[in-house]
Amino acid sequence: MLRRQMQLDFSGIKTYSAEDRHNLVTIDNMMTPGVTPHEEYKYEGFDELVERIVKARKNGRPVIWSMGAHVVKNRLSRYVIELMKMGVITHIAANGATSIHDFELAYLGGTSEDVPTAIEDGSFGMWEQTGAWMNEAIQRGAKLNIGYGEALGEYIDMHPEKFPNREDCILWNAYKLDIPATYHIALGTDIIHQHPTCDMEAIGKCSGIDF
């Protein structure tokens, strides 16, 4: 059956090296538990939330940490990693953007491009390493019938030479600690979906396995 509507060809898309990009978040300005000074967090219900988490873990119950990318963009990755290492967090659940910022920190030591400038000059999201490596990892994961998070964590673990900053990567730490890290993807919403090597079937399969 012939396709009625023309499909866009991504093969001619031009990408840029992320090494040349200015990043708003770097491993040098990340916050560190017990080191970085901060104001006391005051929010109604926060103390109760903490108490419930502590109670849950004391009773052997899981704590599923559901988050978006701004946890990473606000330089808080090390706090999440510390909570995993302490045995507080037993499951990471996040969206695609979270995995991208986390992945970029691992290989580049920085993430969060200057969006207004990047949109203006047409470079937004067109980063070769991020798109190529993440899609490579995901497609490998699809062939192995493993989830999105495990596929990325295993890829980072297999290529230490590419990821000198992986100690600050949430998904890699989850992989090493044998904590599930699941990523729940909306197709077409992440920058790696516009990369020439993107395989939507592989992304859907791996994210579906995570679900």
List each language-model region with its residue ranges.
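Metallocofactor- and cofactor-centric catalytic cores in central/energy metabolism, strongly enriched
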Residues: M1-Q129, W133-K143, E150-F211
